[in-house]
Amino acid sequence: MKTMITLLFSALCVATVSAQTDEKDNAMLNNGINFLDIPYVAHTLEVTDGEEELIINCDEVDCTTFVEYTLAMALSPTEDGQVAEGDFATNLQKIRYRDGKINGYPSRLHYIADWVNNGIRNGFLEDVTTAYSPYTQKVSLSYMSSHPELYKQLS
């Protein structure tokens, strides 16, 4: 339960920077609540040894997939309260992969900073950093490329 509350908080944080209307922000919360009874399982995307593909598994989530699914649902049009599967998959791919293009394992956005920047660049997140803090820090992210032996998809 503590994990799901933390995940809900994460979704709310994403909702505050979502470039959508208040109605969409409410959709983030409502979508997140729907995941309360869904088990937390680590590495839910590491299920294939072959070519990178769009994995959708709403029966179990990790920290990242929880937020990705919640945001993809909020960005997708609904009909009779249901999200169209095709729209959901299209939005999920835009969220999860650099510029929405699946081009192998490295095209997946593994670092949250890259994930946020991709969202800002593609218009479904808004950078509110300067509105809340005058302090920013640029970081260089290279752990995965510096340690490829730790990732079977990179070794």
Description of each model-found segment:
Residues M1-M4, M28, M73, M144:
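Detector for methionine-enriched segments
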Residues M1-Q20:
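Bacterial Sec-dependent N-terminal signal peptides
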Residues L12, N31-N34, F66-T70:
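Residue-level detector of alpha-helical secondary structure
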Residues D25-Y40, L45-E46:
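Sequence/structural signature of beta-propeller domains
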Residues Y40-S155:
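Acidic/His-rich structured neighborhood in mature extracellular/periplasmic domains
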